[in-house]
Regions:
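Condensing-enzyme catalytic core mediating Claisen C-C bond formation in acyl metabolism
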Residues: 1-60, 68-69, 142, 208
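Active-site-proximal gating segment of KS-fold condensing enzymes and close homologs
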Residues: 80-96
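A general structural signal for well-ordered alpha-helical packing
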Residues: 24, 46, 50-53, 84-89, ...
Length: 208
C-alpha cells in the first residue's frame, strides 16, 4: 500500500498546440468492462481484462499488435498478475497481424505501492512519460518471474531496471533525457477494480 495522487491535464490538441505547451501523449482510445466474477478476484480466463482492452483498441481503431508497451494493473497477486498477462498474450495470439517484437509489460506499483483510488492516474502519468521519453519503467523488486506469466515471444517483462524502447538497452540512471521520437507509438494502461470493474486507456505518441 502507498499514498499518492496524480493529476493529468486533458486538453484539445489544437488548444495545446496554440498555447505552445509540451504534449506528453494523446489519448486515442478508452475501454470499459464489468465481469462481476468475484468480489476481489478477476475471471480466471481473463474475460473482463480482454474485453476492456479490446474495447479500448476498437475505440482507437488499433490492433493489439500496434501496442508497444502495457503498464499493467498488476498488484503482485499470483492470481491477478497471471490472468492479466495471459489476457495480453491471448489477444496477441488471436491477432491476425504479425508483430516483430514482443509487447513490453511492467507494473509501477513496486515504485509507489498500491495507491488504490489514485493508482490509475499516477500510473497513467508513468505511461505518458514512457511514451514521451521512450524509457519503459521496470517492475521494481521483481526477482523471479512466475512461469505462469511467461509467454515466450508474446510479452516481455521489464524486471530490475528501466529499458530504452528503441535500443532495448538497460538504463541504470533515473536521469533520462527526453526524446520525442522515442519509438514508442502506442502504450496501454490497465486499471482494474474490485467486483470486476475494468478500464483501459491507450495513449499515442503525437510526435511520431
Amino acid at each position: 500500500m502507498g499514498e499518492g495522487a496524480g493529476i493529468l491535464v486533458l486538453e484539445e490538441m489544437e488548444a495545446a498546440v496554440k498555447r505552445g505547451v509540451p504534449i506528453l501523449a494523446e489519448v486515442c482510445g478508452y475501454g470499459l468492462s464489468g465481469d462481476a466474477y468475484h468480489t476481489t478476484s478477476p475471471h480466471p480466463d481473463g474475460i473482463g481484462a480482454m474485453q476492456s482492452m479490446s474495447n479500448a483498441l476498437r475505440d482507437a481503431r488499433l490492433d493489439i499488435s500496434d501496442i508497444d508497451y502495457v503498464n499493467c494493473h498488476a498488484t503482485s497477486t499470483p492470481i491477478g498478475d497471471a490472468i492479466e498477462a495471459k489476457a495480453v498474450a491471448t489477444l496477441l495470439e488471436k491477432s491476425t497481424k504479425k508483430k516483430n517484437r514482443p509487447i513490453y509489460i511492467s507494473s509501477t506499483k513496486g515504485h509507489t505501492g498500491h495507491l488504490l483510488g489514485a493508482a490509475g492516474s499516477v500510473e497513467l502519468a508513468f505511461t505518458a512519460l514512457a511514451v514521451q521519453t521512450g524509457v519503459l519503467p521496470a517492475t521494481l523488486n521483481l526477482q523471479d518471474i512466475d512461469p505462469a506469466v511467461q509467454f515466450e515471444g508474446l510479452v516481455q517483462h521489464i524486471p530490475h531496471n528501466a529499458i530504452n524502447y528503441s535500443s532495448g538497452h538497460v538504463i541504470d540512471s533515473t536521469a533520462v533525457p527526453v526524446d520525442k521520437s522515442s519509438g514508442v507509438r502506442f502504450a496501454m494502461k490497465n486499471s482494474f477494480g474490485f467486483g470486476g470493474t475494468n478500464a483501459t486507456i491507450i495513449l499515442r505518441n503525437p510526435h511520431i
